[in-house]
Amino acid sequence: MINEFIAKIPKAELLVHIEGSLEPELLLQLAQRNKIKLPYSSVEQIKVAYQFKNLRSFLDLYNAGMQVLVKSEDFYELTLAYLRKAASQNVRHAEISFDAQAHLERGVKLETMIMGMTRAFQEAQKEWQISANLILCFLRNLTEDAAQKVLLQAVEFKDSIAAVGLDSVEMNNPPEKFKAVFDLAREYGFYTVVSAGEDGPPEYIWQALDVLKASRIGYAVRCVEDPDLMNRLNLTATPLTICPVSNVKLQVVKSMQQHPLKKMLEQGLCVTISSDDPAYFGAYVNENFSAASAAMKFRKADVYEMAKNSFLASFLESSKKEKLLSELDKFYAQV
C-alpha cells in the first residue's frame, strides 16, 4: 500500500550524479561508439563489477565508467535516459550534479557537457513535463585553485547552471579548504550545496554551514552524533538530501534498520530522499523511499512531508515551486 503511494506521489530529486546514472547497457553502447576499451564485454560482467565493497572501490569503478562520455550526444543520451526513468517515478523536478573536472581532464569541454545535458532537459520538459537544473560539483580531493579555474569557466554558462557543489572523497578534505571559491561562487549568483557528514565527521557539516554558507547539505547522516548540530539544523530548516540505499551500499551505515533518517525526520529536520548514483546502487528514488519505508515503517504523512521538503528545498523559482506544491497537496488530499 505504501509503495503504491510512494510510486504515485509527485516529488523532486535533489541529489543525483548524472555519471552515476550510467546503466550497463548504455555504458557498453557508448564505449563501442567512442572506441573506448572496457574491461567488460557484456552487461552481465558490468553488473558483477557494480558489486563494490566501499566508497573508494565504488569511486574507482565510477571514474572508469565515465570515460565513455566524450561527445555532447553522450551527455544528452545519458541525461535523457535518467530523466525518462525519473519521470516514470513521478519525479517532477530534478537537480542533477555533474563532475566537470573529471571530464575536463580527459579533454572534454564544459560546453560539450552542458549542451548535451540542457538539450535533454528541453526534450524531457516537452515529452514528460519534468524540469531540471544543473549543479556543477568541485572534486574535493583536488585543489581550491583547480575548483576556481572551473568556476571561472562556469560563469559563461550561468544561465544553465543553478548551483555549485562539493563532492567526492570526504575524509581529509574538509569543506573549509574551499572557502574562497564558494565565496566567489555566491558573488556570481550561484546557489551552493555541500556533501558533508557521510564518512566525514559532524564538524564537516558545521563547516559546510558556517564557512561555505551552503544552501543545502548532502548526506549529513552523522549530524545525529552532535545534539547541538541537530538543533542548529532544526532551527535553520537547512535542507538535507539523504540517500539511504547509497548509505547502506557504501557501508556508511551497517543496515537500513540502523539508518538515522527516521530519527532526523522525527526531530523535525528538513530531510528529502534521493538516489545518489542509481545505476550503481540499483535503486532510483522510489526504490530508496521503499527500502527506507520497509525498515522504518513510514506513514503516508512521512512520505508526504519528505516530498514537500524536496520541492521547498529545490532551486526552482517561487512560482514554479508553488505550482508543484499545489499539485502535491491536491494528490495528497485525494488519497
Name the predicted role of every residue range.
Residues 1-190, 199-204, 211, 216, ...:
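Metal-cofactor-binding active-site regions of metalloenzymes
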